[in-house]
Structures are given as C-alpha cells and as structure tokens.
Amino acid sequence: MIDFQNRRAIVVDGHDAIMTYTTAEDLAAVVVRAVDLDGEWPMIGGISGDKLPISQILQIGEKLRGEACHIHSILGCSHGITGHPFTIDKVKLEDLENGNLTASWTLEASHPTVTGDQVDKMVKTVLIGTLIGSAKGAWNVSDEVNKLLPDFRFTQIEDFLAKIWHGKP
C-alpha cells in the first residue's frame, strides 16, 4: 500500500511484489481496438499496463515527491531536486495471514451510516487482503489481449504519476 500524499508505504517483508498499473484511458482504448479484431479472443483476457516491482514504484515516488534543493554546493544537489524518502513499514506475511496488522498507520475511511468500529474493521480487512494479495501475485496481471495489439503503447506509471503530482507539495 503506497500513500504518495504522505510519502509512506506498507510493504510485505521479503516480497517485492509486481504491481500492474493500467490507466482507465488505456483500458478503454484497448477494448475499442480489441472489439474490432478478427479471430477468436483468448480464454483469459488479461490487459496489462505498466508492470513494476513495488521497490521501483517507491523510487519513482521518492523522485517525484522530492523537494527543492536550496543549498546546492553543500548537499551536492546538481539538478535542483532532492529525493524525499518514503517512510516504509514492513509487515510479516504470517502476521497478515493471522489477521494482525502491525503497521504504524492504516487506511482512513468514513461513512455516515457506518460506525467507527465497523469502518476500522472493514478498512483493516481490505488493507490486509490487499497486502496478502500483492505478496501472492494478485496484482501481476496477465497480458493476453496486449499480445493481440502489439503496437499499442500503454501509459508508463512514472509518466502518469509525474502528471498527477506536478506542482503539488
């Protein structure tokens, strides 16, 4: 779980899970093209955008969420930007599988018809499930449909995040 806004993440210790990021625009464009294809569609219809290990996504986040460097000579900052390290909580897969979340933070959610305890339990369950899923490869999407459209270029996660975070503190 990566929180770019607050420069922090929760990762499963010992697992550098592959994450697949596909923009809604790319998904729509692929579906439009695929509908017009001749022939038989594959039984499994994976559409896979950019695939990166979590460690690389965190590096991109640290780069994009950097801070202006004001003391170039002392810090050795030649590009005018310093990376801003993310705080990374590592949790054990065994703890997660036993329903224990040991991270220093969690997701936040609220709803006027749901009590705080119910929300907390639901958010914890979703976060644990997401982390277990990542460690077990659930976010490494297959690419059967990609192979039918070899000329299609998916949005790269770094380009997408750079656009989203440009000019934001």
List PLM regions with ranges.
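Oxidoreductase cofactor-interface core, primarily capturing Rossmann-like NAD(P)-dependent enzymes
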Residues: M1-H70, I74-T87
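Surface-exposed beta-strand-to-loop junctions
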Residues: R7-I10, A138-S142
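Short, surface-exposed beta-strand/loop "edge" segments at domain boundaries and coil↔beta transitions
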Residues: A17-I18, K136-A138
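Tryptophan-centric aromatic hotspots in well-structured domains and transmembrane helices
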Residues: Y21, T125-V126, F160
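Short coil/turn linker and secondary-structure boundary residues
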Residues: T22, L52, V91, V114, ...
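Hydrophobic residues in alpha-helical segments
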Residues: A34-V35, S134, I164
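Terminal hydrophobic/aromatic helix or amphipathic segment near a protein terminus
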Residues: L58-G137
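Amphipathic terminal alpha-helices
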Residues: S142-P169
